[in-house]
């Protein structure tokens, strides 16, 4: 998930938003979440959520729900989201 945080005036502001999103997604969906890029930029963040399942359909449902919840939490700050599969 690629985010643009125009309101962030410092890394502290950014960390506050990213931590809130990570905690929310972990709690609601039992997924692993990490900031994976743009760590030193105040107004950008790239966050990944990961789930493991023997059922690809179920994993897809979880990741769709994660994306929807992130969009609700972030609003227009969520620029894009993609799903990658490892077989």
Predicted regions and their residues:
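Short, charge-patterned binding micro-sites
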Residues: 34-55, 86-87
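N-terminal first-folded block
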Residues: 1-28, 32, 69
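A structural signal for short, well-ordered beta-strand segments
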Residues: 1-3, 47-49, 81-83
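Short beta-strand elements
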Residues: 29-36, 77-83
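Residue-identity detector for glutamine
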Residues: 9, 39, 43, 61-64
